């Protein structure tokens, strides 16, 4: 499984940037996506995929310890849908 450090190393290798500059670039991409999503905007990366905020409706759940029914409030969750190029690359 690759992690953030692996991604930073790949960016540094591909761009000949230092790892410090690559880390800043990767952090900027992640924080930018987070910023757009927090404003309710969709981030579309053609071929790679779409990041968006989806609304989850209020629903009933159960407390696993007591079995009592509880109300779970509506919430917003981040979502990602892979694009065609990414899906094809994984096949």
Curated annotation (Swiss-Prot):
GO biological process, one term: chromosome condensation
Gene Ontology terms for molecular function: DNA binding; structural constituent of chromatin
One GO cellular component term noted in the UniProt record for this chain: cytosol
Source taxon at top rank: Bacteria
Gene3D superfamilies according to UniProt: IHF-like DNA-binding proteins
Record keyword Ribosomal protein present: no
UniProt keyword annotations, A-Z: DNA condensation, DNA-binding, Virulence
Coiled coil: none
PANTHER family per the UniProt record, alphabetical: DNA-BINDING PROTEIN HU, DNA-BINDING PROTEIN HU-BETA
Family indicated by similarity: Belongs to the bacterial histone-like protein family.
Task performed by this protein: Histone-like DNA-binding protein which is capable of wrapping DNA to stabilize it, and thus to prevent its denaturation under extreme environmental conditions. Also seems to act as a fortuitous virulence factor in delayed sequelae by binding to heparan sulfate-proteoglycans in the extracellular matrix of target organs and acting as a nidus for in situ immune complex formation.
Protein name in the entry: DNA-binding protein HU
């Amino acid at each position: 499984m690759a992690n953030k450090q692996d991604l930073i190393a790949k960016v540094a290798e591909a761009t000949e940037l230092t790892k410090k500059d690559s880390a800043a670039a990767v952090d900027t991409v992640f924080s930018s996506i987070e910023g757009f999503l927090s404003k309710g905007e969709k981030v579309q990366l053609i071929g790679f995929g779409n990041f968006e905020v989806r609304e989850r409706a209020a629903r009933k759940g159960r407390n696993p310890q007591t079995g009592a029914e509880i109300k779970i409030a509506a919430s917003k969750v981040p979502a990602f849908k892979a694009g065609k190029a990414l899906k094809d690359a994984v096949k």
